[in-house]
From Swiss-Prot:
Cytoplasmic side: 29-45, 90-118, 176-196
Protein name, entry field: UPF0056 inner membrane protein MarC
Bilayer-crossing regions: 8-28, 46-66, 69-89, 119-139, 155-175, 197-217
The organism's place on the tree of life at top rank: Bacteria
Gene: marC
Disulphide-bridged cysteine pairs: none
UniProt membrane topology term: Multi-pass membrane protein
Keywords linked to the UniProt accession: Cell inner membrane, Cell membrane, Membrane, Transmembrane, Transmembrane helix
The organism of origin for this protein: Salmonella paratyphi A (strain ATCC 9150 / SARB42)
Family: Belongs to the UPF0056 (MarC) family.
Length: 221
């Protein structure tokens, strides 16, 4: 049982900086300004469902994609590390706010024409929460745990859905409490937390690249 808790804790530590629910909260508040309470709650719930579904598909279909295109685990680690480090760098030194991204601007224009437009999938679930970095990390981690032998087989089967469900529930709770979070933390607090998470992501990405290079050296030495 301790192995299960360890796997869940490790998964949340890896995924939450990438998912970064607080950034999604700021984006949600910017896009849902004209929605009533019931519609906001519906969008929050649907965004969480979409995030869970995207993560599940990435985890279980990722290996199939790798095998189909002949992608090696070291190659995936290096590519995933580059993406994660790049996303972390952008969080550490942001060029634009979350609500200024192309996806958010496009959705804002759509909301101006149709106030009840769906914002749950784009941009809240993807790319804000379950974006390219999150998907790359999930696929890479799936390959690592399946071939690493660090956890028992039953933990590898049970832990991922629990981790993805926990991330989705955390996102749902943050979106439902978005107003209170913004009043408590403020925009400055969210930016500070995002920069800290960005630094962690840069470190994780660099470590992924190092592990990939070392595995290539070990394989072809």
């Amino acid at each position: 049982m301790m192995d299960l808790f360890k796997a869940i804790g490790l998964g949340l530590v890896v995924l939450l900086p990438l998912a970064n629910p607080l950034t999604t909260v700021a984006l949600f508040l910017g896009l849902a300004g004209n929605m009533n309470s019931a519609e906001r709650n519906r969008q929050s719930y649907m965004a969480s469902v979409y995030v869970f579904a995207i993560m599940m598909v990435a985890y279980y279909a990722g290996q199939l994609v790798m095998n189909t295109f002949g992608i090696s685990i070291p190659g995936l680690r290096i590519a995933g590390g580059v993406i994660v480090a790049f996303i972390g760098f952008r969080m550490l030194f942001p060029q634009q706010k979350a609500h200024e991204s192309p996806e958010a601007k496009s959705k804002s224009e759509e909301l101006a024409d149709e106030p009840t437009a769906n914002i749950a999938f784009v941009p809240l679930a993807m790319p804000s929460t379950a974006g390219p970095g999150t998907i790359a990390m999930i696929i890479s981690s799936a390959s690592t745990v399946r071939h690493g032998g660090e956890f028992p087989d039953w933990v590898i089967m049970v832990a991922p859905p629990i981790i993805f469900l926990a991330v989705a529930v955390i996102l749902w709770g943050c979106l439902r409490s978005s107003g209170a979070i913004m009043r408590l933390v403020g925009k400055g607090g969210i930016e500070a937390i995002s920069r800290l998470m960005g630094f962690l992501l840069v470190c994780m990405g660099v470590q992924f690249i190092i592990n990939g290079v070392l595995e290539i050296i070990k394989t072809y030495h």
